[in-house]
UniProtKB/Swiss-Prot annotation:
Domain (KH-like) ranges: 355-439
Function according to Swiss-Prot or TrEMBL: GTPase that plays an essential role in the late steps of ribosome biogenesis.
Residues annotated as domain EngA-type G: 3-167, 181-354
PROSITE patterns reported for this sequence: G_ENGA
The keyword NAD is assigned to this record: no
Protein name from the UniProt record: GTPase Der
Family per record: Belongs to the TRAFAC class TrmE-Era-EngA-EngB-Septin-like GTPase superfamily. EngA (Der) GTPase family.
GO biological process entries: ribosome biogenesis
Source organism: Janthinobacterium sp. (strain Marseille) (Minibacterium massiliensis)
Keyword Repeat: yes
Binding site for GTP 1: 9-16, 56-60, 119-122
Length: 447
């Protein structure tokens, strides 16, 4: 399980800047306006070989009673509850404020490990920038500049050390078939995940094992369907009650992200009785960014009028067009309708994600693509695409070598992606294209 780090602090202390540096993204909007980040933002980071999840929160006012600041306080409290370590950020330029003291009181009661971090400390002596903050009684502060990156790596290394040190030893996971497909079923609350889980895990097909006792554990449930082996990855709290498994529907973004990161294939479940929501799109976006193979299931399809079905299909095309590489199935988990074909698509998506693409075939496909459509010139320079090879699986990565490839635009990369998909029947998996300019090591004339 990846450690979870929450970034907490009053408005405008640099939480989003630190989030962007940790995740190497611009996902959270950054500007000098208090309260600009309205909701929790989630991202993946990595220090060396150690991955982690990071939560960026809105500016925290624990005692806010109404309005947007009240909603942001609720979101922040949830982030603290989900975190292994809390990084409490204060502003070294402004010094200690009453607001910082209020947040300290809340964090002290939370029971979480808290690291006090003084940001915006560039050009200032440690003793000068930290002096006021000892009053908070949270030990020696860490000093960083999120904008310039000073001290950030050391901070995260220590946060991860704390997170791992406080975790209990991991119990041995239940035995599963090495060839099984690890499947995560994700979606917002009440779309029917628990019903689908029970349909897939019919008691006669479940391999018996002891469930971990805490919802923070990752649960792996091996099962077999139509002769195929799967392992259901669940961190949302599946519990045995009597003779059935019951999935708790309480939605947790962190647990959803953990499930996605541990899976081979993700089944995104939507509710046909409701329009596609912003939350649906956010989950879909993270699946895409994670590079996981994907199947979309639209549940509660039975009983809908033809007009409503048309509306849902249009909604899918409009709001989730970036998932066009994945197959969509219209199902009823309650009546077990359409489940078989959907699971066949799970198998197909996994096979596509694990495709072994030979260098000669990739290079041939690349040459065919260039013959069909050459990249545009950039000024006097036209990119030369020479050969391609596979750079990884799950998702497949196609590495293209040539000259002046930095001049290739996003439209041409999409054209190449589409061509490789069609050539190698890559349905249900993201496909990454990497461009590398330089000499062809296989060319005798360039040795």
């Amino acid at each position: 399980m990846k450690p979870v780090i929450a970034l907490i602090g009053r408005p405008n202390v640099g939480k989003s800047t630190l989030f962007n540096r940790l995740t190497r993204s611009r996902d959270a909007l950054v500007a000098d306006l208090p309260g600009l980040t309205r909701d929790r933002h989630y991202g993946e980071g990595r220090v060396g070989e150690r991955p982690f999840l990071v939560i960026d929160t809105g500016g925290f006012e624990p005692v806010a009673k109404e309005g947007i600041m009240h909603e942001m306080a609720k979101q922040t409290k949830q982030a603290v509850a989900e975190a292994d370590v809390v990084i409490f950020i204060v502003d070294g330029r402004q010094g200690l404020t009453p607001h910082d003291k209020t947040i300290t009181d809340f964090l002290r009661k939370s029971g979480r490990s808290v690291m006090l971090v003084v940001n915006k400390a560039e050009g200032m002596k440690y003793t000068t920038v930290t002096a006021d903050f000892y009053e908070l009684g949270m030990g020696d502060p860490y000093v960083i500049s999120a904008a310039h990156g000073d001290g950030v790596n050391d901070l995260v290394e220590e946060a991860l050390n704390i997170a791992f040190a406080q975790r209990p030893p991991e119990e041995e996971a239940p035995a599963s078939n090495d060839r099984s497909i690890k499947l995560a079923i994700v979606g917002r609350p009440n779309v029917g995940k628990s019903t689908l889980v029970n349909t897939l895990l019919g008691e006669e097909r479940v391999i018996a094992f002891d469930l971990p006792g805490t919802t923070r554990d990752s649960i792996e449930i091996p099962f077999e369907r139509d002769g195929k082996h799967y392992t259901l990855i669940d961190t949302a709290g599946i519990r045995r009650r009597g003779k059935v498994f019951e999935a708790i529907e309480k939605f947790s973004v962190v647990k959803t992200l953990q499930s996605i990161s541990e899976a081979n294939v993700v089944l995104l479940l939507l509710d046909a009785q409701q329009d596609i929501s912003e939350q649906d799109a956010h989950i879909a976006g993270f699946i895409l960014e994670s590079g996981r193979a994907l199947v979309v299931g639209v549940n509660k399809w039975d009983g809908l009028t033809s007009d409503r079905r048309d509306e849902i299909k249009m909604d899918l095309e409009r709001k989730l067009s970036f998932l066009s590489f994945a197959k969509t199935h219209f199902v009823s988990a309650l009546k077990s309708s359409g489940i078989g074909p959907m699971m066949k698509s799970v198998d197909g998506a996994y096979a596509a994600a694990m495709s072994n693409l030979s260098t000669p075939k990739l290079t041939r496909a690349l040459i065919e693509a260039v013959e069909h459509q050459q990249p545009r010139r950039k000024g006097s320079i036209r990119p030369k695409l020479r050969y391609a090879h596979q750079g990884g699986m799950n998702p497949p990565i196609v590495v293209i070598h040539g000259n002046a490839l930095e001049a290739i635009d996003a439209n041409y990369k999409r054209f190449l992606e589409k061509h490789f998909r069609e050539t190698f029947s890559l349905v249900g998996t993201p496909l990454r294209i990497e461009l590398r300019s330089g000499k062809n090591p296989f060319s005798r004339s360039e040795k």
